[in-house]
């Protein structure tokens, strides 16, 4: 877990550098890492997920960002894909590489100013982040598409935080069906490796009981 904590410090450091260099101006922060750093989600993740919300010359932006990261870190991968800008880099001060993924398509989304912080770092970064309701919308789509148990963990977290569900009956049925397919080892390893011991033990024992209850309420409404 010490490795994951140090990685979190790395994430905050990078966000602070990006903000100070004005790279965050056209972007909004989202995804699991955003939920952890801005809303205290108790699951570790290793990527920074961002979305363009303003029109910029993306080719020029990508070139500038590559140069900036190369000057501060060891840049190991940089690709301008059709849908995303992908950059991966490492630092001798931290044990894991960090990946930044920026969605290129500009879509209407709900966001607000939040403070990204870590209990393991003194730095705090004020930035634009998805609202809980927008995060819920994104997570429902991701869970149905990827069927990744970590997305379902995030969904349960969002429901506990009071995020509006926006889950229709068809989606609720599909999500519930996917949950029944998760094996014991998926809870212990795939999900458990991203959780602290207490939270891991809870989910190995209780699975997604709360989420399933809420999905059933949605189907029966």
Description of each model-found segment:
Residues 1-27, 38-40, 53-221:
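Structured mid-to-C-terminal alpha-helical surface segments
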Residues 29-33:
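Glycine-rich beta-strand-to-loop/alpha-helix junction loops that act as flexible
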């Amino acid at each position: 877990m010490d490795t994951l904590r140090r990685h979190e410090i790395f994430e905050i450091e990078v966000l602070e550098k990006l903000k100070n260099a004005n790279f965050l101006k056209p972007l909004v922060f989202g995804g699991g890492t955003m939920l952890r750093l801005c809303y205290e989600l108790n699951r570790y993740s290793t990527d920074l997920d961002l979305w363009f919300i303003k029109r910029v010359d993306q080719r020029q932006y990508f070139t500038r960002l590559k140069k900036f990261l190369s000057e501060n870190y060891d840049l190991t991968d940089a690709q301008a894909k059709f849908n995303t800008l992908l950059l991966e880099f490492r630092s001798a001060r931290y044990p894991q590489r960090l990946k930044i993924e920026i969605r290129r398509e500009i879509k209407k989304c709900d966001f607000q100013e939040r403070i990204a912080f870590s209990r393991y770092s003194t730095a705090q970064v004020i930035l634009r982040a998805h609202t809980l309701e927008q995060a819920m919308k994104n997570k429902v789509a991701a869970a149905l598409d990827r069927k990744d148990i970590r997305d379902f963990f995030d969904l349960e977290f969002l429901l506990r935080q009071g995020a509006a569900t926006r889950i229709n009956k068809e989606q609720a049925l599909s999500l519930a069906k996917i949950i029944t397919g998760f094996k014991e080892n998926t809870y212990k390893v795939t999900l458990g490796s991203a959780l602290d011991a207490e939270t891991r033990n809870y989910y190995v024992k209780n699975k997604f009981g709360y989420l399933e209850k809420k999905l059933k309420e949605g189907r029966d409404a």
